[in-house]
UniProtKB/Swiss-Prot annotation:
EC number: 2.5.1.16
Residue ranges of domain PABS in the record: 6-239
Highest rank taxon of the organism: Bacteria
Record: residues binding spermidine: 65, 89, 159-162
Name of the protein: Polyamine aminopropyltransferase
GO MF, one example: spermidine synthase activity
Length: 286
C-alpha cells in the first residue's frame, strides 16, 4: 500500500505520549514478522517505522548509528570480523565499514523485506550494501549465534528494535551467553539499550543481565530526537575490565574526520552514568 497525502505520522507511547512527524507515507505493508512503513518526513527526510515505532530517518540516524558502532569498534582488540544482528536499514554496517581494518561483516536480519525496502527507499542511509566485505544473511540472529563457532567474531553489534515481536529474544541471558561464547578474546559486544527515561525497567534489567554474563557491562548515553523522550542508551560489554575507556588513537584519528558526532570527548562523556540509574541498579541488587 502506498499513499501521497501529507499526514502526521505518530508513534504512541503507552497511550499517553505521542512522538510525531509530518510527512508522506511512501509504502506500507505487513511482512510475516511486522508492519513496515516507509515515510518521507518534512523534518528528517525519509524514514522507517516498524509496527508503528520509529526506527530511523535520514537526517536523524547518525545520532543512533554512530553511538552503537564507534565506541566498540575503537576499543576492541581486533575488528577484523564483525557480526551485526538486525540493522536491516543498512546504517550500522555503513558505519562499521568505514574502518579499513574490517575484513568481514555478517549482517543477520530476520525480515528480508526490511532490507529490500530499505535498499529501495533509504539509499541515503544504507550506502554500503555493495561493499564486498559485507555478507547479508536473512534469518534469525538468535539461532545464528546459537550455532556460530566459538571465538569467531571480534565485535557483535545488536541493532534490534524494542523487546517485543521478532526482537524479544535479543534481550535475554541465553542470547547474551551465546554472544560471549562467539566473541574472540578482547572482543566487544554492544546493543541498543532503550531510553532510561521511557523504558527504565528494561534498561536496568539489560545492564544487570549483561553484567552477570560478561566481566564488565557499561551503559552509555546519547540522544536520538525521534525516539521516545529523545534520550537513548546503548550497552557495552566485554571480558576486559576498563576496555571501554581506551579507544585506540589510530582508529580515532581515522574515524573522526568521517563522522558527524563521534569523537574522543563524546566517547568519554557518553559513559557518565546518571545517579538514578546507579540507585536503580543498587535497589535491584538488594
Amino acid at each position: 500500500m502506498s499513499a501521497d497525502a501529507p499526514v502526521w505520522i505518530d508513534e504512541v507511547f503507552e497511550d499517553r505520549v505521542r512522538y510525531g512527524l509530518r510527512g508522506q507515507i511512501l509504502w506500507e505493508e505487513t511482512s510475516p514478522f511486522q508492519k513496515i512503513t516507509i515515510v518521507d518526513t518534512e523534518h528528517y527526510g525519509r524514514g522507517l517505522l516498524l509496527d508503528d515505532c520509529w526506527m530511523t530517518a535520514e537526517r536523524c540516524e547518525v545520532c543512533y548509528h554512530e553511538y552503537l558502532v564507534h565506541p566498540p569498534l575503537t576499543t576492541a582488540a581486533s575488528i577484523a570480523r564483525v557480526l551485526v544482528i538486525g540493522g536491516g536499514d543498512g546504517g550500522t554496517v555503513r558505519e562499521v565499514l568505514r574502518y579499513a581494518e574490517v575484513e568481514q561483516v555478517d549482517l543477520v536480519e530476520i525480515d528480508g523485506r526490511v532490507v529490500e525496502l530499505s535498499q529501495e527507499y533509504l539509499g541515503a542511509i544504507g550506502t554500503a550494501w555493495a561493499d564486498p566485505r559485507l555478507n547479508v544473511k536473512i534469518g534469525d540472529g538468535i539461532a545464528f549465534v546459537q550455532t556460530a563457532p566459538d571465538a569467531s567474531y571480534d565485535v557483535i553489534l545488536v541493532d534490534g528494535s524494542d523487546p517485543a515481536g521478532p526482537a524479544a529474544g535479543l534481550f535475554n541471558r541465553e542470547f547474551y551467553e551465546n554472544c560471549r561464547r562467539v566473541l574472540k578474546p578482547g572482543g566487544v559486544f554492544a546493543s541498543q539499550a532503550e531510553s532510561p527515561d521511557s523504558f527504565l525497567a528494561v534498561h536496568l534489567e539489560m545492564i544487570e543481565t549483561l553484567s552477570a554474563v560478561f566481566a564488565e557491562a557499561k551503559p552509555y548515553y546519547g540522544w536520538v530526537p525521534m525516539y521516545p523522550s529523545g534520550w537513548w542508551s546503548w550497552l557495552y560489554a566485554s571480558d576486559t575490565p576498563g576496555q571501554f575507556q581506551k579507544p585506540q588513537s589510530d582508529r580515532l584519528a581515522a574515524i573522526e574526520p568521517q563522522v558527524e558526532i563521534y569523537n574522543r570527548d563524546i566517547h568519554q562523556a557518553a559513559f557518565a552514568q546518571p545517579n538514578f540509574v546507579r540507585r536503580g541498579l543498587s535497589a535491584r541488587q538488594g
